[in-house]
């Protein structure tokens, strides 16, 4: 039965109390979307988002060795489809809004980076995990 399955979604979570705090995670997410989006199999996703030609543009920059240029192709409009952004006080609501009824678990794609740099940062996620566990 499907009751025994969990759907675990790694998510690009852009979280911080200020825009400056969030900017780093936003740019990491932008680069990841550019990297994944350069794969031809992902072209249809950009087409569905009304951004045809994005994969071709990414591949062109990639072949030229312009990795930084790849990120510039991922506009804020494109990026918002792939990220959940908020403050520490609002990110749980953003996660719930996006994944309620779809995922049984959501994993912060950048969690290992944050933990490696500052093991204490994990404590900030406990109230978020609790809020999500208590969500309907």
Predicted regions located by residue number:
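Active-site-adjacent structural elements that line small-molecule/cofactor binding pockets in enzymes
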Residues: 1-136
């Amino acid at each position: 039965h499907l009751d025994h399955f969990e759907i675990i979604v790694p998510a690009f979570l852009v979280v911080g109390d200020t825009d400056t705090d969030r900017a780093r995670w936003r740019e990491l997410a932008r680069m990841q979307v550019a990297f994944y989006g350069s794969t031809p199999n992902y072209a249809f996703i950009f087409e569905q988002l009304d951004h045809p030609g994005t994969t071709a543009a990414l591949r062109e920059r990639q072949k030229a060795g312009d990795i930084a240029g790849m990120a510039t192709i991922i506009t804020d409009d494109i990026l918002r489809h792939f990220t959940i952004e908020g403050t520490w006080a609002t990110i749980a609501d953003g996660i719930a809004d996006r994944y309620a009824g779809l995922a049984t678990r959501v994993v912060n794609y950048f969690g290992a980076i944050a933990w490696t740099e500052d093991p204490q940062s994990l404590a900030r996620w406990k109230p978020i995990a609790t809020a999500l566990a208590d969500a309907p």
